[in-house]
């Protein structure tokens, strides 16, 4: 008896037309063969309108793998001018970091000295030039110390480091001087 009453209630609810059924989407009937977009295509010779980067790839170069050593963060750029060095040092000082100069007389890049795998000391640590410049507020002071370093070691590499004494990490490091012929 209960099952017959349930089925009668179900049939009654199906036969009723509700507002929700009036707004239902038509069922999917398959893909239509009529084109939605126009079939004519405008030829455009402008390379920027092409969606693929095929034309742009021809403009790219592969960096030579032999004879081109990479030193620090900005080493893919041409050597920095005096004004560009001053600008980088000013950024370092504005960020609240402490400038520090380091130099290396033999190798200006990370190298593997003791094994085939990179070790802890293999070319990553350079000799510090004097002490970190605590309290330095002017980029000219840092560049003056850089000039003094270059005068003492003209055949060495020099880099400028920005050290954050709160987090106790090195935040910026870039090559400031390469010896002639390097």
UniProtKB/Swiss-Prot annotation:
InterPro entries (UniProt xref): RuBisCO_ssu, RuBisCO_ssu_dom, RuBisCO_ssu_N, RuBisCO_ssu_sf
Primary site of residence: plastid
Residue runs in coiled coils: none
One cellular component term from this protein's GO annotations in UniProt: chloroplast
Keywords: Calvin cycle, Carbon dioxide fixation, Chloroplast, Photorespiration, Photosynthesis, Plastid, Transit peptide
Cysteine-cysteine disulfides: none
GO MF terms held by the record: ribulose-bisphosphate carboxylase activity
Keyword match Membrane: no
UniProt xrefs under Pfam families: RbcS, RuBisCO_small
Transit peptide: 1-58
CDD domains reported for this sequence: RuBisCO_small
Family: Belongs to the RuBisCO small chain family.
Known function: RuBisCO catalyzes two reactions: the carboxylation of D-ribulose 1,5-bisphosphate, the primary event in carbon dioxide fixation, as well as the oxidative fragmentation of the pentose substrate. Both reactions occur simultaneously and in competition at the same active site. Although the small subunit is not catalytic it is essential for maximal activity.
Subunit structure, interactors included: Heterohexadecamer of 8 large and 8 small subunits.
Miscellaneous remark of the record: The basic functional RuBisCO is composed of a large chain homodimer in a 'head-to-tail' conformation. In form I RuBisCO this homodimer is arranged in a barrel-like tetramer with the small subunits forming a tetrameric 'cap' on each end of the 'barrel'.
Protein name in UniProt: Ribulose bisphosphate carboxylase small subunit, chloroplastic
């Amino acid at each position: 008896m209960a099952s017959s009453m349930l089925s009668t209630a179900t049939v009654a609810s199906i036969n009723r037309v509700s507002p929700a059924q009036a707004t239902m989407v038509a069922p999917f009937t398959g893909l239509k063969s009529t084109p939605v977009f126009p079939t004519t295509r405008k030829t455009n010779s402008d390379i920027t309108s092409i969606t693929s980067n095929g034309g742009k790839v021809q403009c790219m170069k592969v960096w030579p793998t032999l004879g081109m050593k990479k030193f620090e963060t900005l080493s893919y750029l041409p050597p920095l001018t005096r004004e560009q060095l001053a600008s980088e040092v000013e950024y370092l000082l504005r960020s609240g970091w402490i400038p520090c100069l380091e130099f290396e007389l033999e190798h200006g890049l990370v190298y593997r000295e003791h094994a085939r795998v990179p070790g802890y000391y293999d070319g990553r640590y350079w000799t510090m030039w004097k002490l970190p410049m605590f309290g330095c507020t002017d980029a000219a002071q840092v560049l003056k110390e850089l000039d003094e370093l270059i005068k003492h070691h003209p055949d060495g590499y020099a880099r400028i480091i920005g050290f954050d004494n709160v987090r106790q990490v090195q935040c910026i490091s870039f090559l400031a001087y390469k010896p002639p012929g390097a």
